[in-house]
């Protein structure tokens, strides 16, 4: 393994990515997770640089545009003992990567997906991303956006994610606690992080968010956790209803959590009882990369005349 060597951070001054990076690092340290077992996976975009900027010695994988979830799924299923955290922009995860985003929910792999949600493609000069509202015109666009926006919270819940939350990049302490909860959750977790882009999005600024954001856990009757199967539909309905609240008031916090759903690792073990004891990462391979397991006798038994 190459020596750990963090790179100099080149995000724009005031970028919400700084808060997300700090929250992730603090969450990992406070949970006491062995950093040798942490893998941060990213796609392409400003958020894609995040593995390079960690000051804690984690393993980082900077992957292809829209494919971070696919890479992360392979990493986690190969070695379920790892803590796998995906970082991707709204364009990366909900544009070119939308298929992987939805398919991941059906599997419920035990990993965390952190969505950097700023409404624009920051790396390529501020084009409208899938989360920019129709009719909005940040300074990077010559005309108002003509596409409707994706609702990340509602999409994640309807796709099958079992932990769904929203954070705010400039409230690092609150975001840190969300990330800690997501890591401890047994199943697929999404945190949609509202992240101002001071360079290209002059609508959803820090000042704009600060006047609107409130925390769900300040509501006296808010309880997003499913405790028995009969509660699922009502909890989902309430979470999606809250996700539609946008304008003068914007909620952050945990919208939905359900640990009654078996993780993908548990489902694999049900079909292959030795899976967790003898995962792909533990299987021996030759120097040339070939498996040492001989499966010819097994295939012979299954030949059809």
Curated annotation (Swiss-Prot):
Superkingdom of origin organism: Archaea
Recorded catalytic activity of this chain's protein: a 2-oxocarboxylate + 2 oxidized [2Fe-2S]-[ferredoxin] + CoA = an acyl-CoA + 2 reduced [2Fe-2S]-[ferredoxin] + CO2 + H(+)
Site (Plays an important role in the binding of CoA): 125
Binding site for thiamine diphosphate: 44-47, 65, 91-92, 122-123
GO MF annotation terms: 2-oxobutyrate synthase activity; 2-oxoglutarate synthase activity; 4 iron, 4 sulfur cluster binding; magnesium ion binding; pyruvate synthase activity; thiamine pyrophosphate binding
EC number: 1.2.7.11
Record comment: activity regulation: Inhibited by low concentration of 4-fluoro-7-nitrobenzofurazan (NBD-F).
Disulfide bridge partners, by residue number: none
Amino-acid positions noted as binding Mg(2+) in the UniProt annotation, renumbered to this chain: 90, 118, 120
Pfam families recorded: PFO_beta_C, TPP_enzyme_C
Keywords noted in UniProt: 4Fe-4S, Iron, Iron-sulfur, Magnesium, Metal-binding, Oxidoreductase, Thiamine pyrophosphate
Coiled coil: none
Phenotype for residue 173 to A: Same oxidoreductase activity as the wild-type
Subunit-structure text: Heterodimer composed of an alpha and a beta subunit.
NCBIfam families recorded: Oxoac_fdxbeta_Archa, PorB_KorB
Name of this chain's protein: 2-oxoacid:ferredoxin oxidoreductase 1, subunit beta
